[in-house]
Regions:
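Transmembrane beta-barrel strands of outer-membrane/channel proteins
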Residues: 32-36, 105-111, 188-192, 232-236, ...
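Structural signature of Gram-negative outer-membrane beta-barrels, strongest in the C-terminal barrel
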Residues: 21, 27, 33-35, 84-87, ...
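Repeated loop/turn-to-beta-strand initiation elements of outer-membrane beta-barrel proteins
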Residues: 27-30, 101-103, 183-186, 226-228, ...
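Solvent-exposed loop/turn elements at secondary-structure boundaries
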Residues: 200, 206-209, 213, 217-419, ...
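C-terminal beta-signal and adjacent terminal beta-strands/loops
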Residues: 326, 339, 346, 453-455, ...
Length: 640
């Protein structure tokens, strides 16, 4: 448990880098680089009052107890962070020039470690509510009774995620830059990546080996005088599962709600005279929708042994043409296609059904299920998996008393068996056009225009349409119903982007610069209860996994992502730098104005359409992000 500290908001970063280059012979060069970084970060609100609960939903307190005036307090927060991140990296390259070939071999290793990452809870949290129906259908019953006909209740929320973890990234690669002719260069390469993720006790939950990434590229000096160049490349790129997957995943965490009716409220807002609301799923005590009860995680079950890391293929073809000695025209086509993704799946009932298992008990946040042969095994709430692929899930066997036997049962299950009607999809296509006038000692300018489309059902490792940053553990793919009708334009899709920048030396000491960026709007999604037009939203079928207003249907219709857009935005920045000759131009005094016109267009809106079945959320389409306001920055630098 964290406590108040003298310096509640603290961040310190230490970086050390060493580099070596050795020219062993005229044709053999060895280069090596080693670096370390340590980041200390502490965020503990000093205004948090020890021993005083953080309250929520106080307007739902029973007026028969409060007299119609909510009982509250001055508590301002409940959680804190006190973490340290460390990374060590080493890269070694050996380059050998052999005739028209430049051969390079190397290693690229990085180790990331995080200590006490996540957040801890400092005080109790109590949230008040009211309903005459079941609080959590299928799990927690109704608080209503003859003595509480209006269904007033309160629940105690516990949310603790602080843990430690590590990630090892190791790679080796080979490259041949082959100057086939004087004006044609061919690059051939291959890279092998190995990623190992470990939880707080050092257990590896993902150990991905032999991830081969081929690369090929070329550059053609068409006329042999650098007046026109055609270039292209194709390659595969792997992305490691990030460290924070261990938070609320491979490491133990607690996220529970314990529901009570009450007969009184203390002066600090804590409910008193508590009676537990009955569970309807056979359990008792706190309820966690994802099974986060603070119990140890079975890492062999958490991540399938054949889990593949996220990777995509990229293809680029472009050309550059010198229109004049000082003006270049360029064009580039880009195509990226996501081939595999990693996310969490949190529908244990669908998993058990696909595996031919029947739940018979519930213990320590896990289901106990039997197969057709009567064998008993543990089934957790959430598992990492490859959406659209097949994975081998490993279940720990238990005896008749639910004690582990030390053996496991492996079952291969496809995404289709889990109910998904589509695999992972993400394609990005773009055409870039640009005019570049390089700096000649007096002025320079560049204009870029990009036409692009980003479509699919998976943005990547985050879900930015409503700010979900749980990397590789987003709401997407938690259950099949959440992904129905999800294909559309992704949150990072911008159809048109125009960027202009330039600088001009007014005198030998004064330089003025400017940037203009005009961007078309971002896609707007709509999330509601699951009702494509033929489902009663009061029916459990409208919220099959208990996520509330989180499905791609709104107001009885399918809501294709990107059917609406935020407005276009325009940003103008200006800069002025003075370098007096008196100081040999080592002194620079700068003035920068960002967003000169102070445009405040909406860049993101709330996409949740309902707070309850057939109840429109008053915050739906409310702006939650605007362009940053105009700022003026004054700076002084000195180079020596």
């Amino acid at each position: 448990m964290l406590t108040a500290v003298p310096d509640p908001f603290y961040q310190k970063n230490e970086i050390n880098i060493a580099k070596y280059t050795g020219y062993l012979t005229d044709t053999l060069t060895l280069s090596a680089m080693y670096g370390e970084s340590t980041l200390h970060k502490r965020q503990i609100n000093p205004s948090i009052l020890p021993g005083v609960p953080l309250l929520g939903g106080v307007t739902n307190q029973n007026p028969a107890i409060t007299g119609g005036t909510p009982i509250t307090n001055n508590q301002s927060g409940a959680v804190g962070i006190n973490a340290k991140d460390k990374s060590k990296g080493m890269r070694v390259d050996l380059e050998w020039v052999l005739g028209r070939h430049t051969l390079t071999a190397g290693i690229d290793n990085i180790k990331f470690e995080a200590f006490n990452e996540g957040q801890d809870q400092l005080v109790d949290r109590w949230i008040y509510g009211r309903t005459t129906g079941n609080i959590v259908p299928g799990h927690v019953g109704s608080p209503a009774s003859p003595s509480n006909p209006n269904g007033y209740y309160a629940y105690k929320l516990i949310f603790k995620t602080a843990t430690s973890m590590s990630l090892d990234q190791k790679a080796y690669y080979l490259e041949d830059r082959w100057q086939i002719t004087d004006n044609f260069l061919l690059s051939l390469g291959i890279r092998n990546d190995k990623f190992t993720n470990k939880n707080n006790v050092g257990e590896a939950y993902l150990d991905a080996k032999n991830q081969w990434a081929p690369r090929i590229g070329f550059s053609w000096d068409v006329n042999g005088d650098a007046s026109m160049k055609v270039f292209g490349n194709a390659g595969r790129y792997f992305l490691a599962l990030p460290n924070n997957v261990a938070i609320r995943g491979a490491s133990a965490s607690t996220f529970t709600r314990e529901y009570f009716t009450y007969t009184g409220i203390a002066p600090d807002g804590t409910p008193t005279g508590l009676t537990p609301v009955p569970r309807t799923d056979g359990g008792s005590g706190p309820y966690s929708s994802n099974g986060e009860y603070g119990t140890p995680v079975d890492v062999k079950a958490f991540a399938p042994s054949d889990l593949k890391n996220m990777y995509q293929d990229e293809f680029i073809l472009g050309m550059e043409k010198m229109l004049t000695p000082n003006l270049m025209l360029g064009a580039k086509l880009t195509h990226r296609s996501l081939k595999a993704a990693v996310d969490d799946f949190c529908d244990p009932y669908a998993l058990m059904d696909a595996a031919g298992l029947t739940p018979v008990d519930f213990q320590n946040g896990k289901f106990i299920a039997t197969n057709s042969g009567g064998n008993r095994m543990e089934v957790a709430f959430c598992y990492m998996f490859n959406p659209g692929g097949s994975n081998t899930y490993s279940f720990a066997n238990v005896d008749a008393s639910n004690n582990p036997t030390g053996t496991r049962t492996d079952i291969k299950i496809s995404s289709a068996q889990l109910g998904f009607d589509q695999g992972v999809k993400r394609t990005y296509v773009a055409l870039d056009l640009y005019l570049d006038r390089p700096w000649d000692g007096k002025w320079e300018a560049r204009i870029d225009y990009t036409f692009s489309k980003s479509r699919g059902n998976t943005e990547g490792q985050v879900k930015s349409e409503f700010g979900q940053t749980n990397i590789s553990k987003t709401q997407d793919w938690d259950a099949a119903a959440l992904m129905r009708y999800s294909y559309g334009y992704l949150a990072n899709d911008r159809r048109h982007q125009l960027k202009m920048r330039g600088s001009y030396a007014i005198t030998d000491e004064w330089l003025v610069s400017g940037n203009v960026r005009i961007v078309s709007g971002a896609p707007i999604s709509c999330l509601g209860y699951f009702n494509p037009g033929n489902i009663d939203e009061n029916d459990p079928a409208a919220d099959p996994v208990g996520y509330g207003s989180s499905y791609h249907t709104c107001f009885g219709q399918i809501a294709t992502p990107g059917s609406q857009r935020t407005p276009w935005t325009k940003t103008i920045d200006l800069g002025l730098v003075y370098r007096p000759a008196y100081f040999d131009k080592k002194l620079a005094v700068g003035l920068n104005v960002r967003n000169l016109t102070n445009d405040r267009k909406v860049t993101q809106v709330d996409v949740t359409s309902e707070t309850a079945p057939y109840t429109v959320d008053n915050n739906y389409l409310r702006p939650i992000a605007l362009q940053p306001p105009r700022t003026v920055q004054f700076s002084v630098t000195y180079d020596w």
